[in-house]
Curated annotation (Swiss-Prot):
The gene is HORMAD2. Coiled coil: none annotated. Residues 29-234 form the HORMA domain. PANTHER family: HORMA DOMAIN-CONTAINING PROTEIN 1, HORMA DOMAIN-CONTAINING PROTEIN 2. It is found in: Nucleus; Chromosome. Keywords: Chromosome, Meiosis, Nucleus, Phosphoprotein. Phosphorylated in a SPO11-dependent manner. InterPro entries: HORMA_dom (IPR003511), HORMA_dom_sf (IPR036570), HORMA_MeioticProgression (IPR051294). It comes from the Eukaryota. One of its GO terms (cellular component) is chromosome. This is HORMA domain-containing protein 2. The keyword Nucleus applies. Essential for synapsis surveillance during meiotic prophase via the recruitment of ATR activity. Plays a key role in the male mid-pachytene checkpoint and the female meiotic prophase checkpoint: required for efficient build-up of ATR activity on unsynapsed chromosome regions, a process believed to form the basis of meiotic silencing of unsynapsed chromatin (MSUC) and meiotic prophase quality control in both sexes. Required for the DNA double-strand break-independent, BRCA1-dependent activation of ATR on the sex chromosomes that is essential for normal sex body formation.
Amino acid sequence: MATAQLSHSIKIHKASKETVFPSQITNEHESLIMVKKLFATSISCITYLRGLFPESSYGERHLDDLSLKILREDKKCPGSLHIIKWIQGCFDALEKKYLHMAVLTLYTNPKEPEKVTEIYQFKFKYTKEGATMDFDSYSSSASFESGTNSEDIKKASILLIRKLYILMQNLGPLPNDVILTMKLHYYNAVTPHDYQPPGFKEGVNSHLLLFEGEPVNLQVGLVSTGFHSMKVKVTTEVTRVSDLENNLFQENSTTEIAHQGLDFDEEEEECNNHVRQSCSESPLIASVKKKRKKDFPIYFFYEFRK
């Protein structure tokens, strides 16, 4: 049942480029489908461009001028099945409106999982407000606001994916072997104490994550449908990031992760002093393939600039 759910959520008909995301978003159900697809596409992009799984673990889909690699079930690659199971668990928590944040972490030493190489944060909110998209950087900011206009939401989502693709190609190569884990953080007020989505178990309440060098926070973007919003943020060491034009992704502080850990808003911290977590049932070890490149136009970044 869960496998069918994932396949349905990211399935794309070859006859149309528009079916990567829903053609319209007029209600909460369509919004949920949109957020699921955006989340699954983002995870697929990360794992593909970081060379974590073989080509056979991905199918190719197209959205406008983007060629997307989407994770699919590959029985020859247990690691990809692991990731798909984690995505399914996130879908379950999203459907129930429990999921606050999903954190994908890459590290190298199984005895020191707190010493990380890369962190990918996906932060979710459930709202009734209009669609917004906001990007921050040292030197400039770009914002785009509207009501729940389906075309605008699609443009915002494509922009987020473009930024994620470019960021993945500007990160330094990973070590030959890395370990992946995923932790989920919930909204305590609505999440049952004993809730665990498929593929996850009770986690330890700790936000402490360490980098060997100076960390930098890279804001990829935030997309809101009017019913859901998803914010994407990447953290790694400064020395692993190269050639990011105009500091497009960077936050105002490169040391935030060292002091605050994960990306919780101040008001959320006050209400979630004892945030319950789930963690993936077992870490995933991946042998990194050669770093992949995907070529596509980058002009889209500047359409919303003022």
